[in-house]
């Protein structure tokens, strides 16, 4: 089973080329784009996994709903409540932080405690129901990360906040999320630097080892030739 990854941007580390202001601006753009809806098809025993890069201490909310393919109508219809989805989430250290059975439509929530790539997997329990066995499901999934996971309308009603107070709270939480993203980028840069240094060190030691092997082979060949010539009384 291959994990389905999101779109990634690969390039020079922003910490090397960009100032703090530009970095914060780019992170704000990234935050504005975090989270989004998609749908995918899944078979009877098939598992679909997604990789999401998440900073530490960040809340993630996923909303999903399933549709079952109707062969007679040749279209997808809302799945019955008996059809469920099993959701499993693993952190970058491959530890399970969420494993739970949900219904045909539901919402799952978890908070990251380790920065890095989190694996979110879903698969159906269709094998338990002969009616659905062998059918094809369409799963609509919406994952929200960080402050995008907050329902500000609900927060405003619960805490009785004015429009200005709510906006200030949104800005504060956006700044906090930007700080988390910056810390995560620094962590990635540090990890990349350590990996590069380790690789360079291994290459250096391997080059030294190769040189020593070549020198040893050369010395052995010279001694072998000298012994050969002495045996033939050529020297």
Curated annotation (Swiss-Prot):
Extent of the signal sequence: 1-37
Main location: endoplasmic reticulum
Region (Required for interaction with STX17): 121-160
Protein name in UniProt: Transmembrane emp24 domain-containing protein 9
Annotated GO MF terms: syntaxin binding
Biological process according to GO: COPI coating of Golgi vesicle; endoplasmic reticulum to Golgi vesicle-mediated transport; Golgi organization; intracellular protein transport; positive regulation of organelle organization
Residue intervals of the GOLD domain: 47-145
Coiled-coil portions: 154-184
Membrane topology qualifier: Single-pass type I membrane protein
Cellular component aspect of the GO annotation: COPII-coated ER to Golgi transport vesicle; endoplasmic reticulum; endoplasmic reticulum membrane; endoplasmic reticulum-Golgi intermediate compartment; endoplasmic reticulum-Golgi intermediate compartment membrane; Golgi apparatus; Golgi membrane; synaptic vesicle
InterPro entries reported for this sequence: Emp24-like, GOLD_dom
Record localization: Endoplasmic reticulum membrane; Golgi apparatus, cis-Golgi network membrane; Endoplasmic reticulum-Golgi intermediate compartment membrane; Golgi apparatus, trans-Golgi network membrane
Motif COPII vesicle coat-binding per record, residues: 228-229
Protein's job: Appears to be involved in vesicular protein trafficking, mainly in the early secretory pathway. In COPI vesicle-mediated retrograde transport involved in the coatomer recruitment to membranes of the early secretory pathway. Increases coatomer-dependent activity of ARFGAP2. Thought to play a crucial role in the specific retention of p24 complexes in cis-Golgi membranes; specifically contributes to the coupled localization of TMED2 and TMED10 in the cis-Golgi network.
Residue positions the entry lists as glycosylated: 125
Residue numbers carrying N6-acetyllysine: 160
Bilayer-crossing regions: 203-222
Positions in the Lumenal compartment: 38-202
Membership in a protein family: Belongs to the EMP24/GP25L family.
Keywords from the named record: Acetylation, Coiled coil, Endoplasmic reticulum, Glycoprotein, Golgi apparatus, Membrane, Protein transport, Signal, Transmembrane, Transmembrane helix, Transport
Complex and partners: Monomer and homodimer in endoplasmic reticulum. Predominantly monomeric and to lesser extent homodimeric in endoplasmic reticulum-Golgi intermediate compartment and cis-Golgi network. Probably oligomerizes with other members of the EMP24/GP25L family such as TMED2, TMED7 and TMED10. Interacts with TMED5. Interacts (via C-terminus) with COPG1; the interaction involves dimeric TMED9. Interacts with PTPN2 and SPAST. Interacts with STX17; the interaction is direct.
């Amino acid at each position: 089973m291959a994990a389905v990854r999101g779109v990634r941007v690969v390039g020079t580390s922003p910490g090397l080329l960009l100032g703090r202001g530009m970095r914060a601006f780019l992170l704000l753009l990234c935050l504005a784009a975090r989270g989004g809806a998609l749908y995918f098809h899944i078979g009877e025993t098939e598992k679909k996994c997604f990789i999401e890069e998440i900073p530490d201490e960040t809340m993630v909310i996923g909303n999903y709903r399933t549709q079952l393919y109707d062969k007679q109508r040749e279209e997808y219809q809302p799945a019955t409540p008996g059809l469920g989805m099993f959701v499993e989430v693993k952190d970058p250290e491959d530890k399970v932080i969420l494993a739970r059975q949900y219904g045909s439509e539901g919402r799952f929530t978890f908070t990251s405690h380790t920065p890095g790539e989190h694996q979110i997997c879903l698969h159906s329990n269709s094998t338990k129901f002969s009616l659905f066995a062998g059918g094809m499901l369409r799963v609509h999934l919406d994952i929200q990360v960080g402050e995008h996971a907050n329902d500000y309308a609900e927060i405003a009603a619960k805490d009785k906040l004015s429009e200005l107070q709510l906006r200030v709270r949104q800005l504060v939480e956006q700044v906090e999320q930007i700080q988390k993203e910056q810390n995560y980028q620094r962590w990635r840069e540090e990890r990349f630097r350590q990996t590069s240094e380790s690789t360079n060190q291994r290459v250096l030691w391997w080059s030294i080892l190769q040189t020593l092997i070549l020198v040893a082979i050369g010395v052995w060949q010279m001694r072998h030739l000298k012994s050969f010539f002495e045996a033939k009384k050529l020297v």
